[in-house]
Amino acid sequence: MEQISRIGMDTSKHIFQLHGVNTAEEPVLRKKLRRKEMFAFLEKLAPTVIAIEACGASHHCARLLQSFGHSVKLIAPQLVKPYIKRGKNDAADAEALCEAMSRPTMRFVPVKTAEQQAALMLVGVRDRLIRNRTQLTNAIRGYAGEFGLTAAKGKAHLDPLLERIQADESLPALARELFAAQAKEYAQLQAQIDKVDARLIA
């Protein structure tokens, strides 16, 4: 196979489209491969530079290609779009990636390590827990208001509200039971958030 100077690779869950050029900017590689075929092909290929669109699974793919000796460039999708010359499809996207990576002013996304991705996952878990806590807090306030129990906004005012609810014996038994379940859920969420915060600080 003629020497390849760089490759643009359009990725999906199962199919990968490769577009490679030589030093004269002539296309010398156009391949559509399944995942296993693609990794087997690139593992045997002489080290070259490969551009991939930055997306969810691109960092894992980039690390694997780096382990084969290739240099990997990740490019944000919006920076690739101007280089698509014809209708958007896998082959056009791969060619656009190959073209975009050659531009001297192109900005690349650093390839994240597995550890960096795990840390970002932890941040994502925290965000989801915070959203769940906010949703639950709003629900508790809304239900409490229906029984004439109100409190000022803010997380600091929720615990006193829960204490008032627990102490209010005029509430129907079912309402008291449901409020108790929500209070327990809130405490569990807060404990999870505290645990995640401790890991982020460590």
Annotate the PLM regions:
Residues 1-202:
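A detector of single, family-specific signature residues
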